[in-house]
Amino acid sequence: MFKKGFKNIGYFIIVFLVIGLVGCKSHRISEGEKVDIPKFTEVITLKREKDSLGIYNIENGDISKAMETKDMVDVKYNNKNSAYVFINIIEKGKELNKNKITIIKNGKRTILDNFYSASDIDISKEGNKIAYRSFKQDSLQSAEGMKIYDLENKKEIKIKSDVLVSGSLFKWLNEDEILYYGINSEKENKAKIYKYNVKENKEEVYVDNIEGICTYFMPNGDNVLLLSRQGDKFNLSYYNKKDNSFKKISEEVNQIYKGTKSTKNMYFLGKNDLENKDYLYKIDGNTLNLTKLTYDFPPKIDINGGIASDKNGSIYFSGYEDLKEQPLNEIYVYKEKDDTVEIISDKENSYHIMGER
């Protein structure tokens, strides 16, 4: 395990984490009554309430309460296959919060807690597997690496790999294959995006010859949108797997916070290097043209407020209507069909957008 620093607004820090899984039993299964979870819509939001947090469904511009919680900070889910994954805070720490992962699959509860803290959960396309990273202690230096858990069979999946994964740079490509960016220290010193098939226990290079250091990537079908940095230059590019080629999209974006996809296009919250300002961006799925979608409305993007999309091509995100009232934000929606941005929340709160996409 080692770390490599580089600039990210102030400073990026890449921590290369070994893909290694703990061999001992790592979960507890509750065999009690069936756990009922209200069905979530494609897009949901966490909302701060007086003594708790509410999870609210968002659909067609309407916001309605689905359930209440006191300690939940993240949700990943797949309605079709009845898979719901929550991160629950146990207690606050100095550098990290002590937490646990609660899994509800087909009404049965499983707890993962063989770590101090877990984060960056990514759920597979059908909702049967999750990838996440964990920390052994209340310290960012105690990173244990990326882990994969099989929700259906209630067991960790051991990966045979010498690749050191960079932070949270891992994403499911499909139900059985996951992509991750890192270095195989046993063979070379150049980082690449690798693919691992958990069914066949097979690893292979997926994206090679990346220009500089990759700081973000998002699969789009078999292709990959990625942001890289080389010195003081940034490169937003699109990798076409079929012909093994890169197309440069822009050099103006120096950071991507989070992204999502509609059936047509790709979207992300990112920082413009020239203006030092955050925007909601769209990349056209056909032409790969980059477009800013927000200027003065909202006045400021909430880069930590999340982003998600639904089947209608509505892109939900958070922003600040009144800059004096930060950290209270509002919920906005970009409607792909109308090419418009609207505010849909009725008052400011601490919203955090999440969704199936």
Regions found by a protein language model. Give the residues of each.
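A short loop-to-beta-strand structural motif that recurs across blades of beta-propeller domains
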Residues: G54, K100-T102, G145-K147, K192-Y194, ...
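Conserved beta-propeller blade repeats
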Residues: E31-D36, K70-Y84, F115-K129, R133, ...
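Post-signal peptide N-terminal segment of secreted/secretory-pathway proteins
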Residues: G54-D138
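C-terminal motif of bacterial Sec signal peptides marking the signal peptidase cleavage site
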Residues: G20-G23
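Multi-bladed beta-propeller domains
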Residues: Y56-D74, I103-S119, Y149-S168, V198-I213, ...
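Beta-strand C-termini and the immediately following turn/loop, strongest in propeller blades
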Residues: E42-E49, Y77-K94, A131-L140, L179-K187, ...
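Acidic, serine/threonine- and glycine-rich low-complexity intrinsically disordered segments
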Residues: K158-E275, Y279, T287
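An edge-strand/N-cap motif at the start of beta-rich repeat modules
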Residues: I29-K65
